[in-house]
From Swiss-Prot:
It is found in: Plastid, Chloroplast. This is Acyl carrier protein, chloroplastic. The keyword Transmembrane does not apply. One of its GO terms (molecular function) is phosphopantetheine binding. 4'-phosphopantetheine is transferred from CoA to a specific serine of apo-ACP by acpS. This modification is essential for activity because fatty acids are bound in thioester linkage to the sulfhydryl of the prosthetic group. Seed. PROSITE patterns: CARRIER (PS50075), PHOSPHOPANTETHEINE (PS00012). It comes from Brassica napus (Rape). Signal peptide: none annotated. InterPro entries: ACP (IPR003231), ACP-like_sf (IPR036736), ACP_chloroplastic (IPR044813), PKS_PP-bd (IPR020806), PP-bd_ACP (IPR009081), Ppantetheine_attach_site (IPR006162). GO terms for cellular component: chloroplast. The modification O-(pantetheine 4'-phosphoryl)serine is found at residue 90. Keywords: Chloroplast, Fatty acid biosynthesis, Fatty acid metabolism, Lipid biosynthesis, Lipid metabolism, Phosphopantetheine, Phosphoprotein, Plastid, Transit peptide. Carrier of the growing fatty acid chain in fatty acid biosynthesis.
Length: 134
């Protein structure tokens, strides 16, 4: 966690070899809540921070996607992988969502499920729903 007031903050993830340096003009609180990836989108008037889903959730989702689409074991499926790039159509996506719901013990609202296009989006929604269950 980092707090800064009109200063710079430098963060380095232990698993990554990169360092991110950011300069802020207003008070900002940064916390990664146990996630390994933080990304910062800076514009002149605002800062938005998006966090990738936990790696273990992404890996589980990737395995389920590979299983549902009958992909080979050596087929690479990562967080940024789009279902359509794997050859999935709308019916395949419905089957993926059903598999995810069963595996994680959750129910996805249809309007949210229809917006899922990547492994990471699925993982983030799953984490959101699991957190809401607590």
């Amino acid at each position: 966690m980092a707090t800064t007031f009109s200063a710079s903050v430098s963060m380095q993830a232990t698993s990554l070899a990169t360092t991110t340096r950011i300069s802020f003009q207003k008070p900002v609180l940064v916390s990664n809540h146990g996630r390994t990836n933080l990304s910062f989108n800076l514009s002149r008037t605002r800062l938005s921070i998006s966090c990738a889903a936990k790696q273990e959730t992404v890996e589980k989702v990737s395995e389920i996607v590979k299983k549902q689409l009958s992909l080979k074991d050596d087929q690479q499926v990562v967080a940024e992988t789009k279902f359509v790039d794997l050859g999935a159509d709308s019916l395949d996506t419905v089957e993926i969502v059903m598999g995810l719901e069963e595996e994680f013990g959750i129910q996805m609202a249809e309007e949210k499920a229809q917006k899922i296009a990547t492994v990471e989006q699925a993982a983030e929604l799953i984490e959101e729903l699991m957190q809401a269950k607590k």
